[in-house]
Amino acid sequence: DRLDALRWIESADELFGDPFSGVRIVVHGISMGAATAMMVAGEVEHGLHQLPYVKCFVADCGYTSVWEQFKSELSAQFNLPAFPLLHISNWLCQLRYGWNFKEASPLEAVKRCSLPILFIHGDADTFVPTSMVHELYEAKSSPKELWLAPGVDHAHAYRDCTEEYTKQVKDFLNDYMQ
């Protein structure tokens, strides 16, 4: 997903940008999209992806890693421990597809990002535990912001708190989209 998102960002600059246009992009994702946005955040300034027109990120209810999310769901939904099921699944994924669950780590990605990230999370989220946003926030160096939507479950912060959500995002963009 992150590579597709990076290609879209590069395409947007090719389609809409020129050296004088001042293209500015914010990458905003919800749930798995937030995880993708954070994975992109870890690559925008490093390696082959020098994308100076990406100015900031909004990550709404993203998880710390695929491994931790699967582990959480195995426990919450099925009352199963991670071992051996998650370990075997991870091994099979590595054999068949050449990657493993631990590689998909937004937590590690945000550690590499110096651009601003607004973290949003419902404080009643049980699908992606709210504790994960605190881990992400602590791992990210400044600039960063955190807004916890009160009484909100997974991926419903905008739906349930539209006015405050809009204000939080708008204020963040006003601060960082120059």
Model-predicted segments: where are they?
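Catalytic histidine-centered segment of alpha/beta-hydrolase-like enzymes
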Residues: V152-T166
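Gly/Ala-rich beta-loop-alpha elbow adjacent to hydrolase catalytic centers
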Residues: G29-G33, A37
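Hydrolase active-site cap/lid region
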Residues: M39-K102, E108
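Alpha/beta-hydrolase active-site loop
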Residues: D1-G17
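Short alpha-helix in the alpha/beta-hydrolase fold that links the catalytic acid
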Residues: P106, L115, P129-E138
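Short beta-strand immediately N-terminal to the catalytic nucleophile in serine-hydrolase-like folds
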Residues: V26-G29, D60, I120
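Acidic catalytic loop of the alpha/beta-hydrolase fold
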Residues: D123-V128, A155-H156
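Short beta-strand/loop motif that positions the catalytic acidic residue
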Residues: R112-S114, F119-H121, D125
